[in-house]
């Protein structure tokens, strides 16, 4: 007969329950979370016309336990977010794009803002910033083509340039003119990074002057230097350009490892996007069995991004009728999948990437109600 366990050796009941519970996730302050989201994809990478970042903010302090991901924030999706107790909605498309003159119950977009604030839910939108990043929507879409290498169609530039200004001016001056010229240049607004270095020009000791300036200041600098022909004829003007960011930008030009038929590509895209149907326009002189080696793609609406690109295939969500005609006339086949169908599938990959980026501090869920408004009847 086994001996009874002394009461003091039994673990307390509350400790047993604690050991059985899943780990409790830490909350994140909204502004801390927004900063982390901006680190994941800088809003500076978004197109200039876009409206990205934190769009709706409940009064602080606001903590986030559940981040809710959706492609489009409709009223049905908002109701789902409320029911699932979301604290922040990340909506790929910005629900506020055109400025609101009032916030009432009259229009559906106004109602989204009202419901968000009533339920203390923030709204954040990354949109074209996620199009540009190397681990973003367009790179996800390339996976539907099969094995390939890709590069941005329109590379992004660095958000800011440390040098300042738009132009660099360089000239050489002798000791007789140097001090007077430098004094006048320093009086010109928007002149940056003025430096001097010893230089030897045609056997004479001179000083090489270098400065950065704005477009407006450039006119004044040139006017000043033109007063002295010796200085002016030794002047060089360079247009400063921001460096390109590797693997970052709008659209992708993909080169497949092996050419495959258009028919096979259609099957791959349908499988990747989990769609029963897509729309196809076969390029002039091509057939469904024609080989595809190069494909240009752009998630969403790709007309402006794809236009003029040499490829065997354009892949996007939607294009205008006339842009499709133009592509087909140039022997380029077109696959259209409807706008958001080329974006929505990325959300599952995004959920996993953000979980790692945010160190699993919060719950991240993907909407089950979000869907493309267009269906094949």
Predicted regions located by residue number:
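Hydrophobic structural segments
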Residues: 2-377
């Amino acid at each position: 007969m086994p001996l009874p366990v002394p009461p003091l050796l039994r673990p307390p009941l509350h400790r047993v329950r604690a050991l059985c519970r899943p780990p409790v996730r830490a909350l994140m302050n909204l502004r801390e979370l927004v900063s982390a989201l901006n680190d994941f994809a800088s809003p500076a990478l978004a197109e200039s016309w876009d409206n990205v970042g934190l769009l709706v903010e409940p009064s602080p302090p606001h903590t986030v336990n559940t981040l809710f991901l959706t492609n489009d924030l409709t009223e049905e999706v908002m109701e789902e977010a409320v029911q699932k107790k979301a604290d922040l909605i990340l909506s790929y498309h910005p629900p506020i794009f055109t400025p609101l003159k009032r916030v009432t119950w009259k229009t559906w977009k106004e109602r989204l803002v009202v419901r968000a604030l009533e339920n203390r839910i923030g709204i954040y939108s990354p949109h074209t910033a996620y199009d540009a990043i190397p681990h973003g929507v367009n790179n996800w879409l390339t996976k539907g083509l099969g094995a390939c290498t890709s590069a941005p169609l329109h590379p992004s530039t660095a958000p800011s340039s440390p040098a300042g200004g738009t132009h660099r001016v360089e000239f050489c001056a002798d000791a007789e003119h140097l001090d007077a010229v430098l004094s006048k240049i320093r009086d010109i607004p928007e002149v940056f990074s003025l430096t001097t270095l010893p230089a030897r020009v045609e056997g004479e000791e001179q000083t090489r002057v270098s400065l950065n300036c704005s477009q407006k200041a450039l006119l004044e600098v040139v006017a000043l230097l033109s007063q002295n022909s010796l200085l002016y004829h030794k002047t060089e003007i360079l247009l400063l350009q921001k460096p390109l960011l590797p693997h970052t930008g709008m659209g992708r030009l993909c080169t497949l490892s092996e050419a495959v038929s258009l028919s096979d590509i259609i099957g791959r895209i349908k499988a990747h996007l989990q769609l029963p149907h897509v729309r196809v326009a076969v390029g002039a002189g091509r057939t469904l069995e024609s080989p595809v080696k190069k494909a240009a793609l752009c998630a969403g609406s790709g007309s402006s991004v794809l236009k003029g690109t040499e490829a065997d295939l354009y892949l996007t969500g939607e294009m205008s009728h006339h842009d499709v005609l133009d592509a087909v006339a140039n022997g380029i086949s077109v696959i259209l999948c409807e706008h958001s169908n080329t974006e929505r599938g990325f959300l599952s990959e995004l959920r996993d990437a953000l979980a790692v980026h945010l160190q699993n501090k919060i719950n991240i869920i993907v909407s089950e109600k979000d869907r493309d408004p267009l269906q094949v009847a």
